[in-house]
Amino acid sequence: MYKKYTIGTVISNKMNKTITVAVKNKAQHLRYKKIITKTNKYYAHDEHNQCYIGDIVKIRPYRPLSKKKRWILIERIIEK
């Protein structure tokens, strides 16, 4: 079973009711054993426009709301 939520950092809030969240994942390279950090960007729905750049937020998957928006904001963990 997969996790019900993901934690990331808000990198953009210029769209109305939409935030862009960067989620970092760390994995070890199979051959060279180096830790690699991969960053995924997700568009998330922010109903009340309450998030600002730099906030740490919790998001979860949701039904498609637009062409690219498939995540919804659960809560702000750390406010900047």
Curated annotation (Swiss-Prot):
Pfam families: Ribosomal_S17. Disulfide bonds: none annotated. The gene is rps17. HAMAP family: Ribosomal_uS17_B (MF_01345_B). One of its GO terms (molecular function) is rRNA binding. GO terms for cellular component: chloroplast; cytosolic small ribosomal subunit. CDD domains: Ribosomal_uS17. One of its GO terms (biological process) is translation. It is found in: Plastid, Chloroplast. This is Small ribosomal subunit protein uS17c. Part of the 30S ribosomal subunit. The keyword RNA-binding applies. One of the primary rRNA binding proteins, it binds specifically to the 5'-end of 16S ribosomal RNA. Its main location: plastid. It comes from Gracilaria tenuistipitata var. liui. The keyword Nucleotidyltransferase does not apply. Keywords: Chloroplast, Plastid, Ribonucleoprotein, Ribosomal protein, RNA-binding, rRNA-binding.
